[in-house]
Amino acid sequence: MRALISVYEKEGLIDFVKGLLDLGFDLVASGGTSVLLRENGMAHSSVEEVTGAAEMLDGRVKTLHPSVHGAILADLDKESHRQDLAKRSIVPFDLVVCNLYPFFERPGIETIDVGGPTMIRAAAKNHAHVAVVVDPADYSEILSELKALGSVSADTRRSLALKAFELTARYDAAISNWLAGGDSSEKLPKRITLTLERAAILRYGENPHQVGARYRQPGVRSWWDDARLLSGMELSYLNIFDTDAAWRFLHEFEGEPAVAIIKHANPCGFAMRSAIEDAYKTAFEGDPISAFGGIVAINRNVDVSLAGMILSKPKADVIIAPSYDDEALQLMATKRKNTRLIAAPVPERSSIEVRTIGSGFLIQDRDNFRVALGDFKVVSKAQLSDDQVLDVDIAWKLCARTSSNAIVIVKDKMAIGIGAGQQNRVDSARIAVEKAGDKVVGSVAASDAFFPFRDGLDALANAGVSVIVSPGGSIRDQEIIDAADEAGVALIFTGERHFRH
């Protein structure tokens, strides 16, 4: 039997080649692979010896030769193919082992592989006669099958071919998207080639009768790949969805210890304090009923003191933090066996959002904050105090991550009332005021979009809110400003809407 080996990633290769030689394989290797085998005293022929042509153009042309591709592509069931091989003294390959230049990790012209994908596609096309191995993780299985059967089975060859075409498809997609990203004339390219690989099978989807899985882009490492589930049940679809929202939202804030609580992808608690234990306690006080069974994100290490505070509060479905002390982890894992405890790195900022509409897609760039706090405009006669500036920032960011129509009320760096997902802004305001209770007096409220009429602002002002933040932009803006002046509240226009659906 005969094998062609041309790999960039050489992990596990020496043991694999040793196994092939022990099975009596005749080996042909290209470029750096040949050098490695020679250094390890492994018998083989170089591609140059087979083709009679030296590699050229700094290695860009090595295996693109009839003596190589004829040996890969020959359909040995056809007499004409066998005659062509005999006429040219070409010996067919039974096995092609190949992986690619690291374009996923280092995009660039010089990491665009040409010969590798060509060999892989040729071998995968001819999987009736050739086994193509593109993943070092398959080496041991291939050796075991060769030892047991004397050849690679048809079923295995087919599954290897599928993996090979998936690899070349992902590889080409990465190159296409990289080139498209270089065109600065359009914020969104005319074509987006999306390839995904399954990263995890989930217990179920949004509901128990639905199947679910987490996928990722090949070669693009998500923070989820480095997150560690330290205790508790496996994560469900909704656990991941809400935890992702909570962790990303918490990282909108820097500096002080902070805790965010998310339920059904909406904030229902938030607090910043000088001590993380106080932040945890205060975050739950904002809406303790909704917080039960929620996702709790913490931006500090969890020690025994914080673990004690966590155990004194309603049960969370998931707790995510940068790290946990061993004693704290053991305590919580014992007392709250079903709570999922996750240690996670800082989440990356993705540039686009993708949603499905039937068989099509909606794509937009991510809703980032483009207008800085310092550029907000106070449009009312009343002004806000210096100690309300941070509350304005918190309320505005909370509001942007809450389902529209959204009204968020904040006081002393704590969310005290959140009205989310209502079909009219007045109802959102009334819900937020009701949840805030007596704390509403002297608070800051934020609206994710403009007030179309003064009734929403009146509901907040009459309850005792002293500062209201809104994008502005309504044809009735002056009416809204007049209403704020009548009530004596400070009104801020940000100039930036943050609908969320």
Feature annotation, model-predicted:
Residues 119, 126-139:
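Mobile "lid/hinge" segments at catalytic clefts and subdomain interfaces of large enzymes
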Residues 137, 141-192, 313:
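Non-catalytic interaction/clamp surfaces of large macromolecular machines
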Residues 76-124, 376-386:
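Active-site/ligand-binding-proximal alpha/beta "capping" segment
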Residues 1-5, 70, 93-98, 171-173, ...:
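ATP-dependent carboxylate/acyl-activation modules
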Residues 33-36, 50-57, 103-105, 118-121, ...:
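Short gly/pro/ser/thr-enriched loop/turn and capping motifs at secondary-structure boundaries
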Residues 27, 44, 130-132, 341, ...:
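Hydrophobic beta-strand scaffold residues
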Residues 32-103:
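Glycine-rich nucleotide/cofactor/substrate-binding loop typically near the N-terminus or early
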Residues 1-50:
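N-terminal glycine-/serine-/threonine-rich phosphate-binding loop
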